[in-house]
Curated annotation (Swiss-Prot):
GO terms for biological process: response to hydroperoxide. This is UPF0246 protein MADE_1015435. Belongs to the UPF0246 family. InterPro entries: YaaA. HAMAP family: UPF0246. GO terms for cellular component: cytosol.
């Protein structure tokens, strides 16, 4: 079982990391090609392209300018500990034991606009480049054109290496769109999390993102190896709904919103 999640805009390059092991991103050559384009953009270009403040645009222009290889623990950080958004609050990587981190290295992947696909211990440097960014590049008008079937190829290799053909999609639509579903050598299962609001079950973005991280952690800690095992997920008040689920979508409902 292979799990894919989205990255996060917020980063943490300060906290102490509980592991010393690291690996190099598999798609770094592609990243360096993208960086050639990114380095040509001024802060004003980035502000317009990414719809971000001048301050953030300047920060990211500096990040692009300072990007350097080879990656080492001194100039980069393991991906699972570098991202700091709602998904990663749920995942809580810092509290995973060493055996679970090793398991995650084989069974968890992080989609990325700049790095394509990252393993948990792959080193990365700080960046902001969302997958939906319309960044013109030698391959086309946006990042989907750039990555084309590259990410899917690497996912297929990972599926083959870890022994089955089940891919658990815990990524956002923006990021999972970078996966060529027809070319994927596996069955895609998408968990969906709904909270009760005003008497109706709805996807509430903040809660759904955190729940994706909780689900990823659950799979890793419990070494879940089949879809039936996913149905036992009951963390943070979520309960599997057979009625609302299908063969490719597993729906979890929660009656009371958590803090």
């Amino acid at each position: 079982m292979l799990v894919v999640v989205s990255p996060a805009k917020n980063l943490d390059f300060e906290s102490d990391i509980p592991v010393k092991q690291f690996t190099q991103p598999a798609m770094l050559e592609d990243t360096e090609k993208l960086m050639e384009v990114c380095r040509t953009l001024s802060p004003a270009d980035l502000s317009s392209l990414m719809k971000i403040s001048d301050k953030l645009a300047t920060l990211n222009a500096n990040r692009f300018a300072e990007f350097t290889t080879p990656f080492t623990p001194d100039n980069a950080r393991q991906a699972m500990y570098a991202f700091n958004g709602d998904v990663y609050t749920g995942l809580d990587a810092y509290s995973l034991d060493s055996d679970t981190v090793a398991y995650a290295q084989k069974h968890l992947r992080i989609l990325s606009g700049l790095y394509g696909l990252l393993r948990p211990l792959d080193l990365m440097q700080a960046y902001r480049l969302e997958m939906g960014t319309k960044l013109a590049n030698p391959e086309g008008k946006d990042l989907y054109a750039f990555w084309d079937d590259r990410i899917t190829y690497v996912l297929n290799k990972a599926l083959e290496a870890q022994g089955d053909n089940v891919l658990i999609n815990l990524a956002s639509n923006e990021y999972f769109k970078a996966v060529k579903k027809k070319s994927l050598d596996g069955m895609i299962i998408t968990p969906t999390f709904k909270d009760c609001k005003n008497g109706q079950y709805k996807i509430i973005s903040f809660f759904a993102k955190k729940a994706r991280g909780l689900m990823a952690r659950y799979i890793l800690e419990n070494r879940v190896e089949d879809v039936e095992g996913l149905k036992n997920f009951d963390v943070d008040g979520y309960v599997f709904s057979e009625e609302q689920s299908s063969s490719t979508e597993l729906v979890y409902l929660r009656n009371q919103e958590s803090e």
